[in-house]
């Protein structure tokens, strides 16, 4: 997180807490990882009936997912001149998953100095 390197922003984090972190960072869009579980949450921090949408985007993991999907992943974030904090749908977040040779990657881990459990994590998607 912007506050601490060992703080996890899990998907079901309390909305008030997530908004506080984003407001302290002065972030309308915050992209982060660390949990290896991709998600996109749209939060409204507006007051007095005025919308102010903020986007919390966990980009997941390119090659070590922890969501039981063994494929690699990345995010395409689309922002353009019409994007606005007043319109929650004016920012597009697309999660892309792709196949790669997981067994080859796992074997490379096993042949390295890394713990073999990392290879199993690749095979299981955790």
Feature annotation, model-predicted:
Residues 2-4, 36-39, 63-64:
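Short, catalytically relevant binding-site loops at active-site mouths
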Residues 42-126:
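Acidic, His/Gly-rich catalytic cores of divalent-metal-dependent hydrolytic chemistry
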Residues 1-29, 44-45:
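Conserved catalytic scaffold of divalent metal-dependent phosphoesterases
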């Amino acid at each position: 997180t912007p506050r601490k390197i060992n703080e996890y922003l899990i998907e079901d984090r309390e909305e008030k807490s997530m908004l506080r972190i984003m407001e302290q960072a002065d972030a309308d869009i915050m992209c982060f990882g660390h949990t290896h579980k991709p998600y996109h949450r749209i939060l409204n921090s507006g007051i007095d009936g005025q919308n102010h949408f903020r986007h919390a985007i966990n980009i997941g993991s390119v090659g070590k997912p922890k969501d039981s999907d063994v494929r690699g992943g990345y995010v395409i974030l689309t922002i353009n001149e019409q994007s606005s904090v007043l319109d929650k749908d004016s920012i597009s977040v697309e999660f892309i998953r792709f196949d790669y040779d997981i067994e080859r990657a796992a074997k490379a881990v096993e042949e390295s100095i890394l713990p073999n459990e990392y290879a199993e994590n690749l095979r299981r998607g955790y």
